[in-house]
Structure formats: structure tokens, C-alpha cells
Amino acid sequence: MTDSLTIARPDDWHLHFRDGDLLAETVPATANVFGRAIVMPNLTPPVNTVAEAAEYRERILAQVPAGVNFEPLMVLYLTDSTPVQEVERAANSDFVHALKLYPAGATTNSDSGVTDPGKITHLYEAMEKHDVPLLVHGEVTDAEVDIFDRERVFIDRYLADIRDQFPALRIVFEHVTTAEGVNFVREANALTAATVTPQHLLMNRNDLLVGGVRPHNYCLPILKRRQHQEAIQKAVIEGNSRFFLGTDSAPHARTKKEAACGCAGCYSARAALPLYATFLEQHNALDKLEGFASHFGADFYRLPRHTDTVTLVRKPWAVPTVIDAAGEPVVPFFAGEQLPWSLG
């Protein structure tokens, strides 16, 4: 049994920093561990243009702790009216690394998203031409589709066609939650990948609903049946390079989670790497952590792997029960739980 593990510095390929005063909590929490992060653009208003991404990037960089080398990888928010010229500007920038497809109404601050993903093929064509990755929140939002089926229906209705029509387009199936999603990524071409969150790896819908509703485990896409969780786990345990770390860390004030209509999102930034390590060790696959956390995402995004390292030590660490974020209490994912691994 190893008492420490040193890996190349990891990256987080999907997170939500939020904005304003919250950045003072979220940016250091990530930057102290991860070398880079794909930053979601679903602010209010959303980050629609390269110019807006540049301004947001500066606000993030202003909160990076002194002496810490961290690079935010910016993303633009696709809408029905995104011009092709904005895709070209993104491709020509050195800090915008992808465009994000949010079906309108699918998740937090997605009301400005795409109303019909099948009707923006001109944008997919431009992204393919200029080699700008497409990041997908893979859910439909039709009222008649059950919330637990939204990912499967999205694949059948939209994603399979997008993949077939644009074979040279890099696509990331963000926060994959179903066996159908895992199988889609496995069977698609090599320009298809998925990010995996700690909550979808470690939990299923029983952890949300059995014994009472647990609002701090509530996220979108929602937790699914155990069989879907096991499909995600298998992909990570076997070290499939199409699946890599993306926390989807997303803070909300406790008052907005513990409410009659609570917000979706799990704030996992501080605990993420120990959580992934704990899971992999439990499945005798700790040797897969470096690929999953440090190599596969960098390779997919065609960025250099980090040469510096981080070290995890076998030292019990209790996840804080509450974190002060801009004067608001935030309950983190796995709050109060003791993990066997901590950052050295």
C-alpha cells in the first residue's frame, strides 16, 4: 500500500467559476491544484464573444494566488444567433479553446441557449473547419421527456447526427451520466470524448433520494440508476483515454440549495482530486489516476502535458462542512466526510 502518489499536475476540463466576489473562493480552490481549467460560459449574461471571454479571463486571472501558474481555458456560449465570424475569432484567439452547446433551459443560466441543436449546422461546419471543439450539454428539454431520459434522447435526436455529419469536429460529451452516453463515446470516432464528474462516478440517484432528498447531491444532468453509474466507473477504471476529469464544480449558496426549489450543482473543487483517488484505489486502479486527471484531456485538446507535479499523501482529511464564499455559506460536495487522501 503506497503512502503517497505523485502525478503530473492535473487539469479540470469542465468547471464553473461563477463571477464577481465568488471568484475569490473558486479560482484559488482550483488553481492551487489544477494547472488549467475549461471555464464554462453560462454567466448572466453569458460569455458569447471573444471580447467578453477576454474580459472574464482577466477577472479570473486577478484571483490566481501569487506564485501559482494557472491558465483558464475560455469557452464561448453558443446561441441561435452566434455568427460564423465569432467561431473564426475564437479559432484565431490564443485563449478561447471551445464553444459550448447548451440546449435552452437545460441547466443553470441556459435560457439563452440553443433552441434547436439541429438548426445550427453552419456553426458546427465552421467549428470543424477551424478545429474548434464543440462541448455539449447532452440533454433535451422537452417537457414530455422524462428527466432521467433526457441524455439518451439527446443522443438519438441530435448528437449521433452531428457526429456523423461532421466527422472531423472534436466533440466533448460533458458530464456523461448514462450507459448510452458512455457507449456513444466508446463507439464514435477518436475525436469524441467525455468528461466525468466526481458525483456521477461516486453516486447514483439513490444517493439523492433515499432516506430524504439530499440537495447538495443535486446536479444536472441528474444522477441516474446504478447501472449507468457502473458504466461510467468501468470506463474510468479501465483507463479509457476518451474519458477524463471534469468536475463540473458549481457553487451555490446554501440558501439556494436548501430551498423549496433548489439549484443544481455540486461544489467539488477542493475535494475533487482526493475523491477521484479514493474511488480508483477502492477499485485497485490508482495507477489510472494520472492518465485520467493529467494526460487524456491535455492530449484531446492538443495541449502539452504538464511537467510539474502534485502529490497526494495518505493522510485523512475531512471535507469542510461549509465554506465561506463571498460572505455566503456554501456546502461543498461530500461535506463533513473524511477522505483517506489529501494534497501534500
UniProtKB/Swiss-Prot annotation:
Superkingdom classification of source: Bacteria
One Gene Ontology MF term: zinc ion binding
Pathway: Pyrimidine metabolism; UMP biosynthesis via de novo pathway; (S)-dihydroorotate from bicarbonate: step 3/3
Entry's cofactor comment: Binds 2 Zn(2+) ions per subunit.
Gene3D superfamilies on file: Metal-dependent hydrolases (3.20.20.140)
Catalytic-site annotation from UniProt: 248
Positions bound to Zn(2+) 1: 14, 16, 100, 248
Assembly: Homodimer.
Function description: Catalyzes the reversible cyclization of carbamoyl aspartate to dihydroorotate.
Protein name: Dihydroorotase
